[in-house]
Amino acid sequence: MTKPQAAFLTAAKDLLGPKGWSEDPEQLDKVATPWRGAYQGETPFLARPAGTQEAAALVKLCAAHHVALTPQGGNTGLVDAGTPHGEIVVSMTRMHAVRSVDQFNNSLVIEAGAPLVTAQQAAED
């Protein structure tokens, strides 16, 4: 995999729209640092798809340009598996809706970027 080149970045920005990406150093640092702060990752680009179609199109774009990615969900885990090591970060934070609650079967359908507290609140309601 390679670092994102200008053609990839232009296509990704067009795909995601102005709210769907960032190259701001503060935001990049935030997604590259696990919340425990045990160590520091790095990323050149933050992508925030708004839905599954954008996420799928972004993955295809990454594959076509040989750009590695690190997905991040709600970032409520303790294993730091979402820490990037030079890859772009694909943050699912814009995808956080509770899709359904099935009390009879004790199940929830929640989008990938929902933090654990969202699932807990939906289950309690």
Regions inferred by a protein language model and the residue ranges of each:
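Hydrophobic, small-residue-rich alpha-helical packing segments that form membrane-like cores
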Residues: 103, 114-125
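N-terminal flexible segment immediately upstream of the FAD-binding catalytic core
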Residues: 1-64, 77-106, 121
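Glycine-rich beta-strand-to-loop/alpha-helix junction loops that act as flexible
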Residues: 72-76
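Short beta->alpha junction loops/turns
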Residues: 51, 112-113
